[in-house]
């Protein structure tokens, strides 16, 4: 199991409804159904992933979150999850607002562009980094709006979006991020997981 999925599962209560936006092959939904007995639905843009989810018995619809989330009623899910997809949207602010409208809470995870290995790659090699969490070259990446944990933390503050908890992940550990340790955790976390709303 991916460490990120475990950290997300630790936040999600049992027996609730979850919309997984950009659900990919449905691995996270499958985990949450098994471990948390959730009622899950997915929204995925790639047809091959939608077919894979459906073949696994998962409830998934094909669509683009930027154009389809408006069709979901307000507060229609207990949680809405957006796992490592925020940076791929043309208008991430609109998507975040829709997540928080559709769900009572949202979990958003991001690859952290402030991670020390990313910074080092830019500093010493002078080129866009390729890592496990940022696996594409600059010319074939779906990422449009790279940000750091600190950027998203500050964005939420500026837009009055309530942050319930922020978790940082790296190779060896999972740790909570607060204002008091934000600078250090922004440097040493590969992934940031935000529980919002």
Predicted feature residues:
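Short conserved loop adjoining the S-adenosyl-L-methionine
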Residues: 68-74
């Amino acid at each position: 199991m991916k460490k990120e999925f475990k950290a997300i599962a630790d936040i999600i209560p049992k027996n609730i409804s979850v919309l997984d936006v950009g659900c990919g092959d449905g691995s996270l939904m499958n985990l949450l159904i098994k471990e948390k007995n959730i009622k899950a639905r997915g929204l995925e843009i790639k047809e091959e992933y939608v077919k894979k989810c459906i073949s696994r018995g998962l409830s998934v619809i094909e669509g683009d979150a930027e154009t389809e989330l408006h069709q979901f009623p307000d507060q229609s899910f207990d949680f809405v999850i957006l796992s490592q997809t925020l940076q791929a949207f043309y208008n991430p602010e609109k998507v975040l607002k829709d997540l928080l409208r559709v769900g009572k809470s949202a979990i958003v995870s991001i690859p952290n562009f402030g991670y020390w290995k990313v910074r080092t790659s830019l500093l010493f090699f002078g080129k866009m980094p390729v890592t496990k969490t940022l696996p594409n070259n600059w010319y074939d990446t779906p990422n449009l709006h790279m940000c750091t944990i600190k950027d998203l933390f500050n964005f939420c503050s500026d837009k009055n979006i309530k942050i319930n908890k922020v978790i940082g992940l790296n190779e060896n550990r999972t740790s909570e991020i607060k204002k008091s340790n934000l600078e250090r955790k922004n440097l040493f976390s590969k992934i940031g997981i935000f529980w919002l709303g």
